[in-house]
């Protein structure tokens, strides 16, 4: 599911495809370009991934702690908990990339990344994408179709649907692990596709197409839900002013989801999808491949940044989460401060009247 800049194709599941090492070998002797490329691979990328690794551990660790104290009252909260799990698993793959890119691992360390780590990274990235789509559908149903089929709103249905998502992603991912069974050597270790069996290579490409279609489907759902909610709120705000403020908050919530989705996932797929469904890579020269490699790595980094941006969704969209966070931090929300001030004033009034009645 990553770009492989040995590029015969834009394959899917190689997060740690050996584009950097292939590009290094082809760029040797090119002076400044080679030095810049080496610094990008061995210094800049490891530092960037180290930063988001530390940030993600802190943010998602806090999220796990808070969600542990929140009951599964709604399907929305349950979807958020699934995203936390996916983000944490995805985060745990970062150290492997950092070690590889910084040059600290042995040569056969590449095999671990090809067979396990890259598969886990992409499986959990697309799991997060699916749950973001489910959250947008949940917001649409709660705002536009609040009196629809009751089974769609039950927590049992949500749990079953969530299990189905994890099972499907496991079914797509496990063959990529099992069929990456080639004998690693110093000659083939830098190309993950050479470590796959013939069936593994075909499965890998099939999963690449499935994931690309999955992204497009979720993108369409997100945009469709956002437009539908916006239109409904605009239409109903003229009739029911008291209810529209609450529904406007739902609209702001889905805006956060759309913003995170577009920021993290759209750039990478704009870079990847044209190559997945065409033979554009055959038309590119070496300099174009190098530019594509930099674009791929930076847009892939943006996708990885999703693990740090998802906590923003928890904070702005989940009242239970923000309330629990403020409570644990001894910080009052604005509404709580107003209620507390009103309570104090009422107490002062009662004391005044009690005193004057004496």
From Swiss-Prot:
Its main location: membrane. It is a multi-pass membrane protein. It holds the Pfam family 7tm_1. It is found in: Cell membrane. Keywords: Cell membrane, Disulfide bond, G-protein coupled receptor, Glycoprotein, Membrane, Receptor, Transducer, Transmembrane, Transmembrane helix. PANTHER family: G-PROTEIN COUPLED RECEPTOR 87, P2Y PURINOCEPTOR-RELATED G-PROTEIN COUPLED RECEPTOR. Belongs to the G-protein coupled receptor 1 family. This is G-protein coupled receptor 87. The lineage of its organism: Eukaryota, Metazoa, Chordata, Craniata, Vertebrata.
């Amino acid at each position: 599911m990553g770009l492989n800049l040995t590029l015969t194709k834009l394959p899917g599941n190689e997060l740690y495809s050996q584009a950097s090492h292939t590009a290094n070998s082809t760029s040797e002797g090119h002076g400044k370009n080679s030095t810049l490329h080496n610094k990008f691979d061995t210094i800049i990328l490891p530092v960037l991934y180290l930063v988001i690794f530390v940030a993600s551990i802190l943010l998602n660790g806090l999220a796990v702690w808070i969600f542990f104290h929140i009951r599964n009252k709604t399907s929305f909260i349950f979807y958020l908990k699934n995203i936390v799990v996916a983000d944490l698993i995805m985060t745990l793959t970062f150290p492997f990339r950092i070690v590889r890119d910084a040059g600290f691992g042995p040569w056969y360390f590449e095999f671990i990344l090809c067979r396990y780590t890259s598969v886990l990274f992409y499986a959990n990235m697309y799991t997060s994408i699916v749950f973001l789509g489910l959250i947008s559908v949940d917001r649409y149903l709660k705002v536009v179709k609040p009196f629809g089929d009751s089974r769609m709103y039950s927590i049992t249905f949500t749990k079953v649907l969530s299990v189905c998502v994890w099972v499907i992603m496991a079914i797509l991912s496990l063959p990529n692990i099992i069929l990456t069974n080639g004998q690693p050597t110093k000659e083939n270790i830098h190309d993950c596709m050479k470590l796959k069996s013939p069936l593994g290579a075909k499965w890998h490409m099939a999963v690449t197409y499935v994931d690309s279609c999955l992204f497009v489907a979720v993108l369409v759902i997100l945009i469709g839900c956002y437009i539908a909610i916006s239109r409904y709120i605009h239409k109903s705000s003229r009739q029911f002013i008291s209810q529209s403020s609450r529904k406007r908050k739902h609209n702001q919530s889905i805006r956060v989801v759309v913003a995170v989705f577009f920021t993290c996932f759209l750039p990478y797929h704009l870079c990847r999808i044209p190559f997945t469904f065409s033979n554009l890579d055959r038309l590119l020269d070496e300099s174009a491949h190098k530019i594509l490699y930099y674009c791929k790595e930076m847009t892939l980094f943006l996708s990885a940044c999703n693990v740090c941006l998802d906590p923003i969704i928890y904070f702005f969209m989940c009242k239970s989460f923000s309330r629990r966070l403020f409570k644990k931090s001894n910080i009052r929300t604005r509404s709580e401060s107003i209620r507390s001030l009103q309570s104090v004033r009422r107490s002062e009034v009662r004391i005044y009247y009690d005193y004057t009645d004496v």
